[in-house]
Design a protein with these regions (language model features):
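Structured-RNA-binding interfaces characteristic of tRNA pseudouridine synthases
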Residues: 1-275
């Protein structure tokens, strides 16, 4: 069977926009042991049923266990000619309710969900109150202490630009380089939530959660905003704060060249903000 990058003469490439609640999954990537349920595992099984043969998908960004996505993008190759509804409604009928295909688009053979992407955007949602919320369990991160969003936003500006993010990568990160280009990094409040909104050309493993973990130390008054700049310069993960929980992290956008004609985001009802 050809890999997603080895297109046969009779095959064509399809891109899908996916959203999922990652609460119960062991991340995006298919694992060695099938009892570790992943988003990729369920999606490939569903697409393969519609395509009448085994299908392998490639994604824009591999999310960790417990991380959600409102705009994941994948691609796969198939020799079966199906309409748009087959790749959306047909695949959705085979998926658990926590995973949904939102759109499908035919693409040129050189399109790649990961390597064609210009940027990815994540949002991290937090809330503060005396007790944890039952309604927001695993959908937003809980922090009991008061946070100074002005200091956190000032600290986040140290992330901007192209630089080495060794201090904010996971110990097991397999990327060959820690250089990444952060295009925006904003902290703001909306509807009772504190939101970290960050966009970059690509992200290292655990990078957003590690950034958030250190920003929380600034927001709680334990560190000054300039500390983030110092961490970047020192390039030592052990000096930064612990990794923030995955609960409030969402992949919310993937940007591609205009020629691909793909949505960069998926419109969402502001459910969390309406509660």
């Amino acid at each position: 069977m050809p890999t997603p990058e080895q297109v046969t003469p009779n095959s064509h490439r399809i891109a899908l926009g996916i959203e999922y609640d990652g609460s119960t999954y062991s991340g995006w990537q298919k694992q060695k042991f099938p009892q570790q349920e992943t988003v990729q595992q369920y999606l490939e099984t569903a697409i393969s049923k519609v395509a009448d043969r085994d299908v392998v998908v490639s994604c824009a960004g591999r999310t960790d266990a417990g991380v959600h996505a409102t705009c994941q993008v994948v691609h796969f190759d198939t020799e079966i000619d199906r309409g748009t509804k087959a790749w959306t409604e047909g695949v959705n009928s085979m998926l658990p309710r926590t995973i949904r295909v939102v759109w499908s688009r035919a693409q040129e053979d050189d399109f790649h969900a990961r390597f064609s992407a210009l940027s990815r955007r994540y949002m991290y949602l937090m809330y503060r109150r005396d007790t944890q919320s039952a309604m927001l369990h695993r959908r937003a991160s809980y922090f009991r202490r008061e946070l100074d969003e002005v200091s956190m936003h000032a600290a986040a500006q140290h992330f901007l630009g192209e630089q080495d993010f060794t201090s904010f990568r996971a110990a097991g990160c397999q990327s060959k380089t820690a250089m990444r280009n952060v295009m925006h990094a904003n902290i703001y409040r909306r509807g009772g939530f504190l939101i970290f909104d960050v966009k970059a050309n690509a992200f290292l493993q655990h990078m957003v959660r590690n950034m958030m973990g250190s920003l929380l130390q600034v927001g709680s008054g334990d560190k000054d905003p300039a500390w983030i700049g110092e961490l970047l310069s020192l390039q030592d993960r052990s000096l930064a704060a612990p990794t923030a929980l995955p609960d409030g992290l969402y992949l919310v956008g993937v940007e591609y060249p205009q020629v691909c004609a793909l949505p960069s985001e998926i419109s969402q009802p502001d459910l969390l903000l309406a509660i």
